[in-house]
Curated annotation (Swiss-Prot):
GO biological process: farnesyl diphosphate catabolic process; geranyl diphosphate metabolic process; geranylgeranyl diphosphate catabolic process; innate immune response; isoprenoid metabolic process; phospholipid dephosphorylation; positive regulation of neutrophil activation; protein prenylation
Active-site residue list: 208 (proton donors), 250 (nucleophile)
Region span, Phosphatase sequence motif III: 243-254
Family to which the UniProt record says this protein belongs: Belongs to the PA-phosphatase related phosphoesterase family.
Cytoplasmic compartment spans: 1-126, 180-222, 276-289
Protein name: Polyisoprenoid diphosphate/phosphate phosphohydrolase PLPP6
Family annotation (Pfam families): PAP2 (PF01569)
Reactions this protein catalyses: presqualene diphosphate + H2O = presqualene phosphate + phosphate + H(+); presqualene phosphate + H2O = presqualene alcohol + phosphate; (2E,6E)-farnesyl diphosphate + H2O = (2E,6E)-farnesyl phosphate + phosphate + H(+); (2E,6E)-farnesyl phosphate + H2O = (2E,6E)-farnesol + phosphate
Amino acid sequence: MQSPRRNAEGRPLGTCDPSSSGSPAHGGGSRFEFQSLLSSRMPGADPTSARLRASESPVHRRGSFPLAGAGSSQALPPQLPEEDRIDLNPSFLGIALRSLLAIDLWLSKKLGVCAGESSSWGSMRPLMKLLEISGHGIPWLLGTLYCLSRSDSWAGREVLMNLLFALLLDLLLVSLIKGLVRRRRPAHNQMDMFFTISVDKYSFPSGHTTRAALVSRFILNHLVLAIPLRVLVVLWAFILGLSRVMLGRHNVTDVAFGFFLGYMQYSIVDYCWLSPRTAPVLFVLWNQP
């Protein structure tokens, strides 16, 4: 039988001196006294260390609070100032504009039935391109200049001079708006248009449509035509605008704004009407019959 282990004083381990039966601090070599000495030397027992840890706790940090139901070591991220927060609630106007844009793109793609040879109405593409040339600016400018040079009456020259002014105004305004808006043409468009310039890579507004609306209103107000011819002029302008969407050149909103802009351009031309009284220098150039 093995004898129990004894300490340096000859007493068995696990027993204490009868004189130290009170507080463990008075024990000569007991385990309680050893543990109390260790705990008194730990950093947490120092009041200075305790205050330092308390000052570093998340509760004392500015802008952070402990999570509900979590330990004191977990904390929320600091909150941003009111002026730095992003408003995630879009306005009604923004939602409406995005919805209209989505409808515009969807409808334009559905109506682009002549955008390519493989489209559902691809066989009509040559006819649509011929109609496209009828609304191009170059034929109208060259035709107006030719008729102006061949005109033998002051009334005819006055009308043709203002038609030339209207065509130049249309080219200027459309190029300016296209350069400012810079809306790309539809993705299904084929860039095979007749005689394009740098701004023609943009689609808003439709220059053919503005010109068709301007010229048709000009003709209806200054030329004496029979009713069937007047109906044909209106149909030409409307079908030309529709063909821009069918060919995939423009979106629906490009054409709609083009009709509006062309209509308003004639109002500008009518207000600034050129005559031998208001612009005598221009008419002197064509004084020969």
